[in-house]
Amino acid sequence: MADDRITGHMSSHDRPWDKVLINDLTVDAILGILPEERVQAQRVVINLTIFTDTQPAAKSQNIADTVNYAELSSQAAQLTVEGEYLLIESLVEDVAALTLDHPTAKAVTVRVEKPQAVSAAGSVGVEIYRQR
């Protein structure tokens, strides 16, 4: 349940999931429906909270036992730039699916913002929570 992440609900492994964070991943990409957004790349900021169990990696010190945030950051940035999405909603769903392809990721919160899209706002964006 989505609210479980907020309430600290115990998962099937008897404790709340750990979190791997990717904060303020910034890329310039074509994203939006307005004509000017289709020709001029704009700044896009991506934030991921990946819910997982970090204990196996802590014990083994093997990157294969956790979410490789460097690799995932690169993949999410590439997806954003190459996708030339019309809607943020489509992008966040694809980034969530990409994240959940990793075998240790149990759930993810994806937030994508466009800081320059609305001049009177600090940013506009979409945030979703998805789980396996």
Regions found by a protein language model. Give the residues of each.
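N-terminal, polar/charged subdomain of small-to-medium soluble alpha/beta proteins
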Residues: A2-R132
